[in-house]
């Protein structure tokens, strides 16, 4: 029986490459001269440190640009609240989303069921398994999922006939 998996994975090596590019750009840009702006990653968290809110906003733009350049979807970033750090600096934690969360998984299952496609959907941990009798039904399911406005990048893997 044909099937495929819906996952949300982020390539951490590409994230590291993007962060290295941001660090290089911050070191060379004129508007960051003498500032204490930095980005660093620890596991699934990125810490952004900036002098003030305007520099933090610029760092967000740099994150978006460099992630897109490295073919990492910026939707994979979950920005936490901005907090004061030592001195006059501000810090923000950014979580890298990995895996399809249960709330999103239930929403995707509901959307597929509402479309009345001839497929079965099963939630397996942090991924979805979609099975059907015909390959065409699975391709319709992929097209439906791509049309949905999801706040997280989705990949479709293990397409088996």
From Swiss-Prot:
<dbReference type="Pfam" id="PF04461">
    <property type="entry name" value="DUF520"/>
</dbReference>
<dbReference type="InterPro" id="IPR035570">
    <property type="entry name" value="UPF0234_N"/>
</dbReference>
<keyword id="KW-0547">Nucleotide-binding</keyword>
<dbReference type="InterPro" id="IPR035571">
    <property type="entry name" value="UPF0234-like_C"/>
</dbReference>
<comment type="function">
    <text>Nucleotide-binding protein.</text>
</comment>
<comment type="similarity">
    <text>Belongs to the YajQ family.</text>
</comment>
<dbReference type="InterPro" id="IPR036183">
    <property type="entry name" value="YajQ-like_sf"/>
</dbReference>
<dbReference type="GO" id="GO:0005829">
    <property type="term" value="C:cytosol"/>
</dbReference>
<protein>
    <recommendedName>
        <fullName>Nucleotide-binding protein amb3630</fullName>
    </recommendedName>
</protein>
<dbReference type="InterPro" id="IPR007551">
    <property type="entry name" value="DUF520"/>
</dbReference>
<dbReference type="GO" id="GO:0000166">
    <property type="term" value="F:nucleotide binding"/>
</dbReference>
């Amino acid at each position: 029986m044909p099937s495929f998996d819906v996952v949300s994975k982020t390539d951490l090596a590409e994230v590291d490459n993007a962060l290295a590019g941001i660090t290089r750009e911050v070191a060379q840009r004129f508007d960051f001269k003498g500032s204490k702006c930095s980005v660093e990653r620890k596991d699934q968290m990125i810490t952004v440190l900036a002098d003030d809110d305007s520099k933090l906003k610029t760092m967000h733009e740099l994150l978006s640009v460099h992630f897109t350049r490295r073919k990492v979807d910026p939707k994979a970033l979950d920005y936490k609240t901005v907090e004061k750090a030592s001195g006059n600096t501000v810090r923000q934690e950014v979580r890298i989303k990995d895996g399809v969360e249960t709330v999103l998984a239930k929403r995707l299952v509901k959307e597929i069921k509402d479309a009345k496609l001839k497929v079965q959907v099963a939630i397996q941990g942090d991924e979805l398994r979609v099975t059907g009798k015909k390959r065409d039904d699975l391709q319709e399911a992929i097209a439906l999922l791509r049309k949905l406005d999801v706040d997280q990048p989705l990949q479709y893997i293990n397409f088996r006939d």
